Amino acid sequence: MQKSLSKRQFFILSYFAYACTYIARLNLTIASPVMQEQGILTSSQVGAMGGAFFLCYSVGQLLNGFLGDLYPPRRMVTTGLLLTALGNILIGFLPPAGVVLILWGINGFAQSMLWGPLLRALAARFPGNKQAEIASCLVSSVGVGSVLGILIATAAISFQDVRFAFLLPGLIAVLAGGAVFFFFHVPCPCGRTDRPSGSHSASRPGAHRSIRARLSDAGFSRRRFSALCSPRLMILLLPAMFHGVLKDNLNLWAASYFADTYSLPLAELSFYVLAIPILTLLGRLVYPFLLRLCNGREHTVSIHALSVTALCLIPLCLGDVAMLPAAVCLSLIAAAISVVNTSFLSVFPTRYAGCGCVSSVVGLMYFATYLGAVISSILY
């Protein structure tokens, strides 16, 4: 019988798995200016890649958020990581631009398979009074993965060539997928454990269950669907979409913004671009403190963070901003938006753990967020 990981080990594995998705996403931020310079892609094709990623990611979140409450988290997370690895590794062979676009869209869909199931798994492993705090700690993996993604891509391009900016993240995702497959065991609602299937799998009652059976097995009821259609949730979808306008486009276009506006070489460019995920990480790290400061009211934390975002956008919208103030404003926006993002996509969904639809709520919130990202990517 396989021994389950301790809660700490389980959290570390979840942290590593989700950080890998940003390692295999933020590599495009550094690679895109080099690919444009080498004539591999045009700026419009890079924009199309961003739009394809966000579209596939948002649609995938809606679908996979629902499936994440039906299927074992280990299966969902492993599949997502291996598809992410496949997309990045194939892009590393520099196929035609149309193929790159499709592969990056697949990468977006694959990465949508992780967060909902991960939150569901953590909600199953940790008690209710710890769920919001654990979720707000897990989301700092976004900042860690973003920083590592930029550093790995920069090192790969500097010491090898641009193709390694995709090959290395792909290999790291393979490693994470293997670790999740063998060690990510989650207690299921009906008492089973989410373990790798062996020779006895055919005898399991759930080996070939229908969707209806899975719905019944997971306890899906009118109460759950009522929770998903509640006015409280519907009202939050609009601000979630607005915060999505800034969230990922900030990372996608930061390198191009500094390169085009201030004509920076790669070494200096990486320094300024790196400030954004570092401040994003800082925002996520201070979130548990901010949540306690606001007596556990995530909406109050979000209102303050959105106010900071608005203040920092004003000088950028006025134009003619020097490089250092622009970097400071963009970094503060990144930190504030990461705080809002933690509220919407991590803490708020855990409030639905009692209804058994954490992953589904994550899917809805992510869909709204990345719908905003798709719209803004097209406009940019």
Enumerate the predicted regions with their spans.
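Helix-loop-helix hairpin linking two adjacent transmembrane segments in secondary transporters
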Residues: 138-188
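Residue-level signature of mid-helix packing/kink "hotspots" within the transmembrane helices
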Residues: 26, 54-62, 146-147, 277-285, ...
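Helix-to-loop junctions at the C-terminal end of transmembrane segments
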Residues: 61-72, 284-296
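A late C-terminal transmembrane helix in Major Facilitator Superfamily
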Residues: 355-380
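Cytoplasmic helix-loop-helix junction between adjacent transmembrane helices
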Residues: 103-142
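Conserved MFS/SLC helix-loop-helix module at the cytosolic interface between two early adjacent transmembrane helices
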Residues: 59-95
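C-terminal transmembrane helical hairpin of 12-TM major facilitator-type secondary transporters
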Residues: 298-344
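Extracytoplasmic gate region of multi-pass secondary transporters
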Residues: 28-29, 231-284
